[in-house]
Amino acid sequence: MFKVDWDLGPVSKSASDQTKESRKEKKRKKGERKNVGDKGEKLNEKVLKKAKSVTTNNSLKSEIKKEKSVPSIKEKNKGDAKHTKLTSLQQKMKDKLDGANFRWINEQLYTTESDKAVQMFKENPDLFDIYHAGFRYQVEGWPENPVDIFIQHLKIRFEHSNAKKKNNIVIADLGCGEAKIASTFRKSRSLQVHSFDLVAPNEHVVACDIANVPMADETVDIAVFCLSLMGTNWQSFLKEAYRILKVGGLLWVAEIKSRFSDKSGEVFAKELPKLGFETKSIQLQNKMFTLFEFKKVPVHGKCEELPPILSACIYKRR
């Protein structure tokens, strides 16, 4: 009989069992790889978000820093103002210089003939602005401006009463300055204003010598001299007004009282009939100036020369 030893060691697995185990192992490893991949993606997302946040914050900080480094318009203007603002001493010196320039121009206008004044402003146009800036400053201290009184008279006496008439009232503002009368009535249907001065500061004004106005004979209803009988040949201004006025037309004059030889203007009213102007009214109540209204009447023969009844208006030096 054969003796059989049953201790054969580990029993080998069949081929089918080995195949099943191999598949399970592959699935397990695949699952592990997937889990690792998911964790890696999540980790990458977190890292990217954090990196993006850091980048954004850094860029914002950079932009804020840039904005702070660039001054605003307000700060820039404030900085410029520091450089352009005059000190009180500089301002006083500037005011003194402006006042001296105004007085010098004013003296030239009153002590020379009008043709020389025209030439002066042609050569130096800025002088006209300097003069009128100084003149505005002087007028601010007056109780009222005579041009405003003339404007009120035009509104009350002529603008409304002439509204329905076909023909306009023609006004010549002689020595108009900045043409306040023309600008006031620029839309009026009943008043037509022609403005003349040595320089044309705006569209309303025609530059000319007041002794030679570019208007036809007897075409004007009202001629106005508002503080503008300047120059040593002021009588030629009045003769020119007589030429352009219609017979029966009105001459309005406003002048500083200190210019008249009698310090009131009554002697002026008595003398003007020699030039063909009949006195209609004279207003003496204002402390600064006198207002006149004359009417043009026919003159037979040559007009007489007036005596020296109107002196130059020279401002005192401070």
Swiss-Prot record:
Gene3D superfamilies: Ribosomal RNA-processing protein 8, N-terminal domain, Vaccinia Virus protein VP39. CDD domains: AdoMet_MTases. Residues 33-48, 62-83 have a biased composition (Basic and acidic residues). GO terms for biological process: ribosomal large subunit biogenesis; rRNA methylation. Its main location: nucleus. Residues 1-85 are annotated as: Disordered. GO terms for cellular component: nucleolus; nucleus. Its EC number is 2.1.1.287. It holds the Pfam family Methyltransf_8. One of its GO terms (molecular function) is rRNA (adenine-N1-)-methyltransferase activity. S-adenosyl-L-methionine binds at residues 132, 175, 197, 209, 226. It catalyses: adenosine(645) in 25S rRNA + S-adenosyl-L-methionine = N(1)-methyladenosine(645) in 25S rRNA + S-adenosyl-L-homocysteine + H(+). Keywords: Methyltransferase, Nucleus, rRNA processing, S-adenosyl-L-methionine, Transferase. It is found in: Nucleus, Nucleolus. S-adenosyl-L-methionine-dependent methyltransferase that specifically methylates the N(1) position of adenine in helix 25.1 in 25S rRNA. Required both for ribosomal 40S and 60S subunits biogenesis. Required for efficient pre-rRNA cleavage at site A2. Belongs to the methyltransferase superfamily. RRP8 family. This is 25S rRNA (adenine(645)-N(1))-methyltransferase. It comes from Schizosaccharomyces pombe (strain 972 / ATCC 24843). The lineage of its organism: Eukaryota, Fungi, Dikarya, Ascomycota, Taphrinomycotina.
